[in-house]
């Protein structure tokens, strides 16, 4: 898939909470503030949004309400990763069915997959959905990191459009851009690295 989901600043939203559950009025205000402020894409239920600790029902309501509210003004991307491939597929399908423009899928954590295993995991998820998939590489949290060669393999899949690269390695960003070409976007996953990553040819930042 040659067209990037977005260029610029994608913000991983917090999930506002009250003692009784999700604070949807606060989430609505947050979404409107970001759109008015020029944020280029909104990311729901990812690390910052505590997606790993939300229930399936909570996730579904967040996605449905947010997609309806945004109404196509900016891309809505949903964190759907899991260390269980079947769960990542199910979460990704549910997000796409609810109207998400794309999914953000973290490398499987805890199990420490091989590079071949990572390719098989992301390929299985990408095969199961009809929307763009962004790989999320954050080895400080997952214990495993993709290589540039792995990205080059994944970039051949029509649904895998890029990576949120949060390894902290400029060398990996540069090598990935060199190997994968213009059809595979690299977003910095570290706010402090966004300018240098963009200067190297990156698509922006997701943070």
What are these regions (language model features)?
Residues 1, 34, 95, 152-155, ...:
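Structural motif
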């Amino acid at each position: 898939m040659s067209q990037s989901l977005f260029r610029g600043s994608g913000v991983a939203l917090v999930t506002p909470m009250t003692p009784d559950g999700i604070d949807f009025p606060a989430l609505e205000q947050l979404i409107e503030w970001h759109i008015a402020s020029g944020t280029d894409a909104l990311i729901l239920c990812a690390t910052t949004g505590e997606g790993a600790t939300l229930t399936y029902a909570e996730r579904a309501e967040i996605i449905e309400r947010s997609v309806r509210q945004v109404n196509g003004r900016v891309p809505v991307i949903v964190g759907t990763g899991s260390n269980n491939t079947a769960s990542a597929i199910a979460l990704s399908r549910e997000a796409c069915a609810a109207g998400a423009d794309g999914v953000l899928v973290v490398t499987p954590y805890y199990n420490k997959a091989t590079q071949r295993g990572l390719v098989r995991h992301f390929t299985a998820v990408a095969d199961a959905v009809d929307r763009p998939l962004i790989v999320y590489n954050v080895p400080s949290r997952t214990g495993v990191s993709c290589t540039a060669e792995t990205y080059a393999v994944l970039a051949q899949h029509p649904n895998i459009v890029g990576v949120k690269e949060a390894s902290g390695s400029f060398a990996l960003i540069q090598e990935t851009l060199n190997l994968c070409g213009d059809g595979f976007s690299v977003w910095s996953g570290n706010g402090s690295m966004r300018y240098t990553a963009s200067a190297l040819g990156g698509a922006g930042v997701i943070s």
